[in-house]
Amino acid sequence: MTDICTRVAHNLRVAMAHADIKTAEDLSAASGVSVYSIRNYLAKASTPSLESLAALGLALGCTPNDLMGWNTDEAA
């Protein structure tokens, strides 16, 4: 789980920078995901649910796959 938490935290920070969203509060306002949850994701304390990934991706202009670090170009 730690590797997933680390990957999500990193990808979330990168996506926030690309979207020019500077704080967890700003991302919360844009996504509807609680500030508490976003802070936990950034602190590598938990991973987002599918619903949260979708909302965060929509707010950040990316996909849940981008946030999870899943490469959709690779063959299964």
Go through each PLM region and give its residues.
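A short, Lys/Arg-rich alpha-helix, primarily the initiator
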Residues: M1-E25
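Short, charged recognition helix plus adjacent turn
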Residues: T2, N40, L58, M68-A76
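The alpha-helix within a helix-turn-helix
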Residues: M16, S28, G57
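Residue-level detection of the helix-turn-helix DNA-binding "recognition helix"
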Residues: A17, A43, T72
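Short alpha-helical DNA-recognition segment
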Residues: D20-N40
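Residue-level signal for the short linker/turn that defines the boundary of a DNA-recognition helix
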Residues: I21-T23, P48-E51
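DNA major-groove recognition helix of helix-turn-helix/homeodomain DNA-binding modules
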Residues: E51-D66
